[in-house]
């Protein structure tokens, strides 16, 4: 229906028509071929008001008879119906061969060369055809007497409606055309239509250029407006659909791409944060030979090697102090998120890895493996200062630093120095306020979970650590280590008052209390006084019928471990404690002390005992005051019981339980 017409350079609004089109419309008078003028007699004033702008078909291609009629200036007569059909069919065929069909003339603005074409206006001629749906004819707009000037709408849009000069639609028979599909009122979809899907031929753009599409028909769908405005087309006004300023952009796809790009960036940032390899450049020069044709990634700062590159990157970040992952509970920093997740198990109380020997639980398998070395004698790394063995080189290196620095564990609160980190942590707990972990059996509280776990072993009567020399059992490994020193015969700690020597410093400090006159702890039954609270608790067992220490050989029970150890010498037939002044021998050190005081008048001297186990068995009789009866430690004072003693003799009475509870809270 529409086609291009090149108006050229002009100053007035002029419509240029070919001679064939003018002849068909009856606008040519008897003039020469190139000097044709518009003849007013050729108009059809009686038919003009009845014609609509869309009822008349488009002009057909010029034929020889039409040229002859136009040149002679003769009035055109009504052609026969067969000729009309032939002309219209030829016109349809001609229209498909056109490369530049005429369209309505609208001022065009080329965005790329807008400044160069400001002064030159290009117009399009639009001849409405039968592209609209057939329906009742509408009355056309009234044509003014001034001719073509009245048809010019404005200075911006200069066009002439040639439908007023068309023939009656009643005399023409249109060829069958594919009905135009209804516009989809669904949400705006920007992609170009598929001609096979939409049911109309491919459209052509207004001006030739890089964006011009091949065309077979002059029909232009409303949603193929130039792409310049993201607003969807207005379905109520067809005149606004062809305006160049009402195009659209790929809004939905761009938003989808933006969302996808945003999520990709977030995932990339998170991956960088998790991998922690954004600023560490590791090349193949870090690979070293590890034997068996294997290579490991080695750190150049500490020569530590790893099997994977990622572990080396994480290790190097540790040298730089980069720990981006923080614990929300205690604010402790970690290099990897996996380390943080493992640390969070300690706050949750989850320890899935359990030792089968001592039943101690750990959060990591590596900690359990390191702990299992405590149950073995494998210590390949030894300190060259003190000879102490270690299972790992890192432990040895940390231990040797203590020898070199001297002050490595200092409290930031009070400035006290400690030999080990464990002691410093326990001391720092005293500055933190109330305790956190409490025993459900005896209501005793502790600063650390490990202390509570070690304490619970006493209630469970679990003693997994056994001395290989004497068979004595201990609940904790450090107790066994301290006990093993007694078999070596080395006593490094000596009392400055009486000269007595001890293998452990704790035993010497406890012994030093007997030289003071202060005895703050008193028994409310016999009114005896004691230097230590632990000594008073041990004494209270004398007033109770409970005898928790039982001999495995004969089944005899004792109320003190010290007495049980002395009893065990009877089965061995040994009396390790010998008097230096006579030939008397005793199986208990307390009996020897009483013998020397009564027979020889010697109060307290350092005795070389052949039984070093006594120092770990609790306070001995020499540490008690002079008013204490020594019968408590004599073998004759024991109440011997058979193996199958009655339940009344092995259980506490209600009164005794109250007394024990009273002294436990001291």
UniProtKB/Swiss-Prot annotation:
Protein's name according to its UniProt entry: Zinc finger protein 710
Disulphides: none
Transmembrane segments: none
Keywords carried by this UniProt record: DNA-binding, Isopeptide bond, Metal-binding, Nucleus, Repeat, Transcription, Transcription regulation, Ubl conjugation, Zinc, Zinc-finger
Zn finger intervals (C2H2-type): 297-319, 325-347, 353-375, 381-403, 409-431, 437-459, 465-487, 493-515, 521-543, 549-571, 577-600
Lineage: Eukaryota, Metazoa, Chordata, Craniata, Vertebrata
Region (Disordered): 113-141
Keyword Ubl conjugation carried by entry: yes
Species this protein is from: Mus musculus (Mouse)
């Amino acid at each position: 229906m529409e086609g291009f017409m090149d108006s050229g350079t002009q100053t007035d609004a002029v419509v240029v028509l070919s001679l064939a089109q003018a002849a068909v419309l009856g606008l040519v008078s008897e003039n020469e071929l190139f000097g044709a003028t518009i003849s007013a007699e050729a108009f059809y004033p009686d038919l003009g008001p009845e014609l609509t702008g869309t009822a008349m078909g488009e002009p057909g291609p010029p034929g020889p008879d039409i040229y002859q009629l136009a040149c002679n200036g003769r009035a055109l007569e009504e052609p026969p119906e067969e000729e009309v059909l032939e002309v219209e069919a030829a016109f349809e065929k001609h229209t498909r061969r056109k490369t530049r069909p005429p369209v309505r003339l609208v001022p065009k603005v080329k965005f790329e060369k807008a400044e160069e074409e400001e002064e030159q206006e290009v117009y399009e001629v639009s001849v409405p055809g039968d592209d609209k749906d057939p329906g009742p004819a509408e009355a056309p707009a009234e044509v003014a007497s001034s001719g073509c000037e009245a048809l010019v709408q404005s200075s911006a849009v200069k066009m002439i409606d040639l439908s007023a000069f068309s023939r009656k639609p009643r005399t023409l028979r249109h060829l069958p055309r594919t009905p135009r599909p209804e516009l989809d009122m669904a949400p705006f979809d920007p992609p170009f239509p598929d001609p096979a899907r939409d049911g109309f031929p491919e459209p052509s753009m207004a001006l030739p250029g890089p964006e011009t599409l091949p065309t077979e028909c002059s029909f232009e769908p409303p949603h193929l407006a130039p792409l310049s405005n993201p607003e969807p087309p207005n379905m109520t006004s067809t005149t606004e659909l062809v305006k160049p300023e009402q195009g659209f952009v790929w809004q939905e796809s761009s938003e989808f791409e933006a969302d996808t790009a945003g999520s990709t960036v977030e995932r990339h940032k998170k991956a960088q944060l998790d991998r922690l390899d954004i600023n560490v450049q590791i090349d193949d020069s870090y690979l070293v030979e590890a034997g068996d044709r294997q290579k490991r990634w080695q750190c150049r700062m500490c020569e530590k090697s790893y099997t994977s590159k990622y572990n080396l990157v994480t290790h190097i970040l540790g040298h730089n102090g980069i720990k981006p992952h923080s614990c929300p509970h205690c604010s402790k920093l970690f290099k990897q998120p996996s380390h943080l997740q493992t640390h969070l198990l300690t706050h949750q109380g989850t320890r899935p890895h359990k030792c089968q020997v001592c039943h101690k639980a750990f959060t990591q398998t590596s900690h359990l493996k390191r702990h299992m070395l405590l149950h073995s004698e494998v210590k390949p790394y030894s300190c060259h200062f003190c000879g102490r063995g270690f299972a790992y080189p890192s432990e040895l290196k940390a231990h040797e630093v203590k020898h070199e620095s001297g002050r490595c564990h200092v409290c930031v609160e009070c400035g006290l120095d400690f030999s080990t980190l464990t002691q410093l942590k326990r001391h720092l707990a005293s500055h933190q306020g109330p305790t956190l972990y409490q025993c459900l059996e005896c209501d005793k509280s502790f600063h650390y979970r490990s202390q509570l776990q070690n304490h619970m072993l006493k209630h469970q009567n679990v003693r997994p650590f056994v001395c290989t020399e004497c068979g004595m059992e201990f609940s904790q490994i450090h107790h066994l280590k301290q006990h093993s020193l007694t078999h070596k015969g080395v006593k490094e700690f000596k009392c400055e008052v009486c000269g007595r020597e001890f293998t452990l410093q704790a035993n010497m400090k406890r012994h030093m209390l007997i030289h003071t006159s202060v005895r703050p702890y008193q028994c409310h039954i016999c009114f005896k006084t004691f230097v230590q609270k632990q000594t008073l608790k041990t004494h209270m067992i004398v007033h109770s019928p409970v005898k928790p220490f039982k001999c495995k050989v004969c089944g005899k029970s004792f109320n003190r471990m010290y007495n049980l150890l002395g009893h065990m010498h009877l089965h061995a037939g040994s009396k390790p404690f010998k008097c230096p002044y006579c030939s008397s021998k005793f199986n208990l050190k307390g009996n020897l002390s009483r013998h020397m005081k009564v027979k020889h008048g010697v109060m307290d001297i350092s005795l070389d005992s052949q039984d070093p186990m006594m120092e770990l068995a609790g306070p001995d009789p020499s540490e008690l005051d002079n008013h204490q009866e020594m019968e408590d430690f004599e073998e004759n004072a024991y109440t011997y019981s058979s193996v199958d003693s009655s339940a009344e003799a092995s259980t506490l009475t209600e009164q005794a339980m109250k007394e024990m509870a009273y002294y436990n809270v001291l």
